[in-house]
Curated annotation (Swiss-Prot):
Pfam families: FNIP. InterPro entries: FNIP, LRR_dom_sf, STK_FNIP-Repeat. Gene3D superfamilies: Ribonuclease Inhibitor. FNIP repeats lie at residues 126-167, 168-207, 210-250. It comes from the Viruses. This is Putative FNIP repeat-containing protein R636. The lineage of its organism: Viruses, Varidnaviria, Bamfordvirae, Nucleocytoviricota, Megaviricetes. Keywords: Repeat. PANTHER family: FNIP REPEAT-CONTAINING PROTEIN. SUPFAM superfamilies: L domain-like.
Length: 394
């Protein structure tokens, strides 16, 4: 049992210091051990996510950094100490000039979102103007699928992470924050980007519909670049020389020979079209992923010169024999193999839909791990060696 006399003798400075190392629940337990400690409640921050209705009547409600506020009860001010704010799936209310209740009086305030907020997730349904609603100091801004409003110069320059979702398709040239490091566009975005992207940008993801020219449009510090299913614009001479990760989600029909910088270590190809695959690959490549549309014969592919290559992954419906010439010691994730393959350690998942004949060597002896569905488990488990670990998913 705690000796309350001894606890009361502890310096408050020491107790305050100890709370920095405790989880929220333990903080509350410690501060409730004696009356003397209760004075620290208004000095200690709480980091977990709390429902607004649970904490707004507490005398120290301003010490909760992360508050979840239900739309139907959005009638009182959001605490000005909140740093992380996420709206729920139904929220679609104006962010400025809103009437709220303060001390039993209805008043009109210009901004709903406190200037203390650093992380803001607008939720699924939000699709209102953001003009004048966001404060300087915001660093992370995430819009949900329904948002498709002009951004003009409404996003603070302090934002470093910006994410748009499904329906956003508005002009961005001249409107993006100059400190951005991460920029994600959703499914429908297909606007010009030349002159739009800041030099600080390191991660850039385009969605399904994007198919705009990228000539001299990409910033020099870009490290990761992802193109969606519709992209089919020239890239030769336009990719940053320091690029490390490049993703094509679908077929690409533009010339690729020597177009990808040697700095690229991770490359995903949906389908290189008429391009020579061997001439597409950068010399320092470590991971090569073939996308869902790739089903080309690899018998002519020589990987001897790619000495850094560690991993090959087939991410779709690949269904070809793999030549014994490809003998690198790596991991291959193959989704749809029906043919035999040799000299590889690998995993089979998702679309495999064939019986494994126990009288025929379908799997190399060094395969140790297979991922299959519950549906297939009963079909094939009895024909697989007991040395192979079988992981089952629904």
């Amino acid at each position: 049992m705690i000796d309350h006399f001894i606890m009361n003798k502890l310096p408050l400075e020491l107790v305050y210091y100890l709370t920095n190392w405790l989880k929220d629940y333990d903080k509350r337990m410690l501060l409730s051990t004696c009356k003397n400690f209760l004075s620290l409640q208004s000095c200690v921050y709480y980091e977990d996510i709390y429902y607004y209705e649970e904490i707004h009547k507490l005398s120290y409600h301003q010490m909760f950094r992360k508050v979840e506020l239900e739309l139907c009860k959005f009638k009182t001010p959001i605490p000005k100490i909140v740093t992380n704010l996420e709206f729920d799936v139904y929220f679609n209310e104006p962010l400025i000039n809103r009437r709220i209740k303060i001390r039993n009086k209805w008043v009109k305030i210009r901004k709903i979102i406190p200037s203390t907020v650093k992380y803001l997730d607008m939720g699924y349904s939000f699709n209102k103007s953001i003009r004048g609603a966001l404060s300087y100091g915001l660093t992370t801004l995430i819009f949900g699928p329904e948002f498709n409003q002009p951004i003009d110069n409404y996003i603070p320059q302090t934002v470093t992470y910006l994410e748009f979702s499904v329906y956003f398709d508005q002009p961005v040239v001249g409107y993006l924050p100059t400190r951005l490091t991460h920029l994600i566009f959703g499914t429908d975005f297909n606007q010009p980007i030349k002159g739009a992207l800041p030099d600080t940008l390191e991660y850039l993801y385009f969605g399904w519909a994007f198919n705009q020219p990228i000539d001299f449009a990409l910033p020099p510090n870009l490290k990761c670049l992802k193109f969606g299913h519709c992209f089919d614009q020239p890239i030769k001479g336009f990719l940053p020389l320091g690029l490390e990760k490049l993703i094509f989600e679908a077929e690409y029909h533009q010339p690729m020979d020597l177009a990808i910088p040697e700095s690229v270590e991770y490359l995903k190809l949906g389908n290189p079209g008429s391009n020579s695959l061997e001439n597409c690959l950068p010399i320092n490549l470590k991971t090569l992923v073939f996308g869902e549309n790739f089903n080309e014969n690899l018998n002519t592919l020589s990987l001897d010169k790619f000495r850094e290559l560690e991993k090959i992954e087939f991410d779709g419906f690949f269904d070809q024999k793999i030549s014994s010439r490809i003998t690198i010691d790596n991991v291959i994730k193959s989704n749809n193999f029906i043919e035999t393959f040799q000299n590889f350690y690998g995993m089979i998942k998702y679309y495999f839909n064939d019986f494994i004949n126990p009288n025929r060597q379908y799997l190399p002896e060094n395969v140790k791990h297979i991922i299959i569905s519950t549906y297939l488990y009963d079909k094939i488990c009895s024909n697989i060696s007991n040395d192979v670990f079988i992981e089952v998913y629904n």
